[in-house]
Amino acid sequence: MPSELPLLTLTIWVPIIAGLLVLATGSDRNANLAKLIALIGALAGFFVTIPLYTQFDASSAGMQFEELTPWIATFHINYHLGVDGISVLFVLLNSFITVLVVIAAWEVVEKKVAQYLAAFLIMSGLMNGVFAGLDAMLFYVFFEAMLIPMFLIIGVWGGPNRVYAAVKFFLYTLLGSLLMLAAFIYLYFQANSSFEILEYHKLPLGMTAQILIFIAFFMSFAVKVPMWPVHTWLPDAHVEAPTGGSVVLAAKIGRASCRERVCCKV
């Protein structure tokens, strides 16, 4: 029987809160405490995702574990979460990789340990929000917010050219996402002021509008995957990023964009 707990909310906010607690440990004098809290937080975030998988009804189509709460009522923006058969696997994988990244950092990172571990935990929660977000604006906030921890990971703990690589990564992905924002705003007005993603594929859009919307989403996700010819930020980011950052770039951010490009119901 499905749990009555807000499991998707927990998958998002458990790692984020754990990350904030890690930040609260302060300087590197408390590095061991920061590592311990980070590991506990990462494991807790992973264990929360297990009921999503075990209780998921694979015989049922559509979204499951849905949570719907008004967020910004004036603009009909809701805190709407849900997962399908693909999303639930990505949430599980994302949380598991976070555990591995935290463990791998124990003996490698020597400066600003708390901040490094917190960045990965917070990004893990934000990425789960990307996989579960069913409100377009909520999804967009999560999709863009996960850039900030990655920008810091590259820019602070990266190689000699880390600042250049971090800025290039941030600008490419941010500017690419503006096309997606424009498409969401257009769909918002076409759907009678609604940001509900599940409603967008029902809209009677003309062929020209469909093509333009497809191009906007395709280009936005292509930058983050990345795909040629908008891939030039990736070599710099991979070379300059610390090991954990490269893992996240390869296994999380790129895969998140692939998933949205294939599965987004718009």
Identify the meaning behind each predicted range.
Residues 56-78, 177-237, 257-261:
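Juxtamembrane/interfacial segments at transmembrane-helix boundaries in multi-pass membrane proteins
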Residues 1-7, 22-103, 107-118, 194, ...:
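Transmembrane helix-loop-helix hairpins at membrane boundaries of multipass inner-membrane proteins
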Residues 12-15, 38-41, 94, 120, ...:
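Residue-level recognition of transmembrane alpha-helices
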Residues 3-14, 83-94, 136-149, 210-221:
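Structural signature of hydrophobic alpha-helical transmembrane segments
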Residues 84, 135-153, 169, 223-261:
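Functional transmembrane alpha-helices
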Residues 19-28, 98-110, 152-161, 225-239:
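C-terminal ends of transmembrane helices
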Residues 28-33, 115-122, 126-209:
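Alpha-helical multi-pass transmembrane bundles of energy-transducing inner-membrane proteins
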Residues 14, 18-21, 37, 41-44, ...:
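Hydrophobic residues within membrane-embedded alpha-helical segments of Major Facilitator Superfamily
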